[in-house]
């Protein structure tokens, strides 16, 4: 039992929506309001577009692409992100970085950048666009399962959205898709 609860969610307190040209006539839901595949919307048997590749987007994409939900899930990203595991050899990733205080951070970043393809953290390996930044110059996305879902075809990768037209969404690569929910 506690006398007080403090929620320290920092800059993530305010839901931000991208401003795409056109109008989407399907359902829209921000991750800020997402609870699970049944609440606040029934997200089963749907054509779903997840926009963004932060940690919340990755977690929601993985959950909604479960075969049991029978969804078609597409992930669209504007700037992309490096996808790193939450754990390496049973240890949290950030604790491994702290074990190398004598190696300059710039050297650590360069070594990781060179090893990115071998480590499987380069999003281009899974059909996503190249990040617009070097590894660790911006917050990476932490997910073990997202690369598996992208690699298996359970999630379809797409570049940024260019415009909306009813239930049709157009992407930078010239393709389009019809979606029930964004």
Task: Write out the residue ranges for each language-model feature.
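Short secondary-structure boundary/capping segments
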Residues: 89-93
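Flavin (primarily FAD) cofactor-binding/catalytic cores of flavoenzymes
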Residues: 1-55, 59-81, 86-87, 101-182
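Basic, ligand-binding patches in group-transfer machinery
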Residues: 97-98
């Amino acid at each position: 039992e506690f006398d007080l609860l403090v929620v320290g969610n920092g800059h993530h307190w305010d839901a931000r929506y991208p401003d795409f040209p056109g109008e989407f006539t399907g359902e829209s839901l921000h991750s800020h309001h997402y609870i699970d595949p049944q609440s606040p919307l029934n997200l089963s048997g749907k054509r779903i577009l997840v926009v963004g590749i932060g940690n919340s987007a990755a977690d929601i994409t993985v959950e909604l692409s479960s075969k049991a939900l029978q969804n078609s899930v597409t992930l669209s990203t504007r700037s992309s992100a490096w996808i790193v595991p939450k754990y390496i050899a049973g240890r949290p990733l950030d604790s491994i970085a702290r074990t190398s205080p004598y190696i300059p951070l710039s050297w650590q970043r360069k070594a990781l950048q060179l090893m990115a393809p071998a480590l499987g953290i380069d999003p281009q390996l899974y059909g996503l666009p190249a990040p617009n930044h070097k590894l660790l110059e911006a917050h990476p996305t932490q997910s073990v399962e997202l690369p598996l879902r992208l690699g298996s075809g359970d999630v379809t990768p797409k570049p940024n959205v260019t415009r909306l037209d009813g239930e049709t969404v157009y992407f930078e690569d010239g393709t389009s898709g019809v979606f029930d929910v964004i």
